[in-house]
Amino acid sequence: MAKKITATNPRLVKLIEILKQESYKNQAKIWKDIARRLAKPRRRRAEVNLSKINRYTKEGDVVLVPGKVLGAGKLEHKVVVAAFAFSETAKKLIKEAGGEAITIEELIKRNPKGSNVKIMA
């Protein structure tokens, strides 16, 4: 029988629990999907470069990355990016483009239903 491995990062465990609760409370399946993606092992979690965010978004979009945002590439327009983690370079480049780098918890507070959010993985 395979041993079930759970996340040991207390911030991640708490975030997954919050996402499941918000999904149930707000009837928003997006949060349950993000919780499932974050529960994966680190090597299978999303790592998205800024160049991909730039390519698939337009001015004013809200993007959610269930993993880490990396600083490769450049961002040419304002976007709000929510992720579990950011590299220092990515944070700097997002702010220089006039956008925002926020946590997933903050996105849940701003948009409990999860509407008009693009998931990038």
Curated annotation (Swiss-Prot):
Signal peptide: none annotated. NCBIfam families: PRK04005.1. PROSITE patterns: RIBOSOMAL_L18E. Belongs to the eukaryotic ribosomal protein eL18 family. The gene is rpl18e. The keyword Ribosomal protein applies. One of its GO terms (biological process) is translation. This is Large ribosomal subunit protein eL18. The lineage of its organism: Archaea, Methanobacteriati, Methanobacteriota, Methanomada group, Methanococci. GO terms for molecular function: RNA binding; structural constituent of ribosome. Keywords: Ribonucleoprotein, Ribosomal protein. GO terms for cellular component: cytosolic large ribosomal subunit. It comes from the Archaea. It comes from Methanocaldococcus jannaschii (strain ATCC 43067 / DSM 2661 / JAL-1 / JCM 10045 / NBRC 100440) (Methanococcus jannaschii).
